Amino acid sequence: MERKTLASLCFFLIVLLAAQVVAQIVPCKTRNRNFKSACIAVSGDNEECDHDCRRVGGWYGGSCKNQKCVCDC
């Protein structure tokens, strides 16, 4: 009986650790609502978006995605 319990506990811990690793891999992105113009990466807006995300939003940075400024949280 103890072996079965120990095996179940080990399996549960492995599943729990695997779930945490998967949760950490998914990047956090949020749209910057303060960036009013269309965000076009080739026009220099990428740097403005990054700066705006860092300065105004307090995020880690940002970039243009689908003409929207998206911040990394």
UniProtKB/Swiss-Prot annotation:
Transmembrane segments: none
Stimuli inducing this protein: Up-regulated during nodulation, but not by Nod factors or pathogen infection.
Distribution of this protein across tissues and organs: Expressed in nodules, but not in leaves, stems, flowers and roots. In developing nodules, expressed close to the infection threads.
Superkingdom as given in the UniProt entry: Eukaryota
GO biological process: defense response; nodulation
Disulfide bond entries: 39-64, 49-71, 53-73
Any single Gene Ontology cellular-component annotation: extracellular region
Keywords tagged on the record: Disulfide bond, Knottin, Nodulation, Secreted, Signal
Cellular compartments annotated: Secreted
Signal sequence annotation: 1-23
Function: Nodulation-related protein probably involved in the infection process.
Protein name per UniProt: Nodulin-1
